[in-house]
Amino acid sequence: MIQIVTVRSGDSVYSLASKYGSTPDEIVKDNGLNPAETLVVGQALIVNTKGNNYYVQPGDSLYRISQTYNVPLASLAKVNNLSLKSILHVGQQLYVPKGTKRAVESIAYLQPSTIPIKESLVNATRAINPFLTYLAYFSFEAKRDGTLKEPTETAKIANIATQGKTIPMLVITNIENGNFSADLTSVILRDATIQNKFITNILQTAEKYGMRDIHFDFESVAPEDREAYNRFLRNVKTRLPSGYTLSTTLVPKTSSNQKGKFFEAHDYKAQGQIVDFVVIMTYDWGWQGGPPMAISPIGPVKEVLQYAKSQMPPQKIMMGQNLYGFDWKLPFKQGNPPAKAISSVAAVALARKYNVPIRYDFAAQAPHFNYFDENGVQHEVWFEDSRSVQSKFNLMKEQGIGGISYWKIGLPIPQNWRLLVENFTITKKG
């Protein structure tokens, strides 16, 4: 049985294997470790324990364990002769009966930064293909004349998806000159001739590459274009051929009257009625230009999902999950150079390099640490690990959410994919 273990001082791959009844090779493989490197105090690993034995970790509760393993809380308590209010102790051994997994859908976004695409990124895409329902190629950019600017090597990426029975998504953005453009969007939404040409080009492109989901990631849409955007989506929906789906990206909102040009044009209720599913960007509370904090703290993410559920069926909701973290220089000041984006693997490597422990914020459900670099500058790092990912999986179960959407491929959390299939059955539609 897979469980998450937090590294303590003196732990090694060999000592953990012995303690939990696993093997060093399995721990190395499941966590993407370099056997020559030491573990970091506070690092979260997944370990395959013997049988159905579970060893209580910091922050655990019976409820959390029952969620993680898809076992009714009362059943877990009863089989271990515990009350529902029993206090657990770190290291305590529990027996966890086999649970029942539910099916969800999953998306991962691919955003190449080079032409041609780096082979390492292509290989990373192939490696996670078995865990995906959809592969989202970011992005086809809308143009003012109703045509599309295609990303590089589209056919190659679409073929990788279909070979793994994954549906390639045609992701269309309103990006112009590197930024999301309200003006560009207005042209498409308000000119019927251009709009119809635009939809025709989209459908022809989707057919050409076998992309059976049409996905609009229109951001920074002018508030006055809210109803025009809804009408546009209805227009696309009526023209979709049989066997195709329509989806959109939504910014994270907690109310229908949330103010700000970033939020107002995204109509959760209308889009929930029109499209087949939505991807909600439940991340970037901690962002490159803001103060250091968790990128997707569990509390705010839950608030967004609860609001979304009040506007649409939960099975239509794909919760956004960041695969990246950020490294901020301190002290933070507005106007500082942006924080550096890093992967989970890179974050742990930094903690190892500077010999600092990784801490875990149980309120935010996110790992973090501080270090001083060679120039004496202090840094603060927030990232994702197996604990924070598992907390999001538990939230999906609690809220009955239809799936998860990862941004983006190439920023590895090695444990994520094993945990995903331990928690859920991934729907394949290809």
Predicted regions, residues:
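Substrate-binding surface in catalytic domains of secreted glycosidases
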Residues: R144-T152, R226-R352
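Acidic/aromatic/glycine-rich contiguous surface patches that form carbohydrate-binding/processing clefts
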Residues: K392-G430
